[in-house]
Amino acid sequence: MRLSRCKLRNSVLWLFGFLAVILVAGTSVAQENSKAGADPHFDIFAEDNYPSASQCAVCHQKIYKQWASSNHAYASISPMFHKFEQAIYDLTQGTIGSFCVRCHQQVGTQRGEPREAPLWERSRVAREGITCITCHRVTEEFGKVNGERNIIPGNIHAPIYNTASGSRFDEILKKKEELKIATSDKERGAKIHSKVIKFAQISKSEFCVSCHQ
């Protein structure tokens, strides 16, 4: 009789121990999912479909420095912009929607970040305002669209679009090993885009009019 009770007690203890392990594991998964939902950087670091200007700076240091002190770089974080945007939003009782942020935070808008999201909850690339990919990942002529144009997603190795005027990119690719650069995730070296595709309109005012009307 005592032996049976001992076996029963051990079985109950084993069952409770097993349930405790499942509970802890489930809590850990829930915490990870919670972090993914709460951290606006989680998906961008995981998929990296909208590269930051800091990634481009590895090669384009001079251009990065020029951009970093420009109005474009401050378009998303400017306190004056946020004051004016909120005032207009209130005056129109919200009917303007994302009219302002479509230009000032174009990447963030395309990523689905809500207009009212505070800066500290936005992705890094959204806080960069008019960043590199805002222009160099556009492949179509949109005209006057108040920022409603499509930015082609893709990691740092995806093609970029430029005038290709005076480009020596093909020469650089021939020296990949010497320069220690990588055009794919399978290669080692400084990560760069794999291709430059000519897009003539990027050098014309018609391209800028998508926002600057």
Which residues does each predicted region cover?
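N-terminal secretory signal peptides that target proteins for export/translocation
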Residues: 1-10
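Bacterial N-terminal signal peptides
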Residues: 14-24
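Sequence context of c-type cytochrome heme-c attachment sites
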Residues: 29-128, 133, 140-203, 207-213
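The N-terminal extracellular segments of secreted preproproteins, especially immediately downstream
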Residues: 4-5, 15, 58
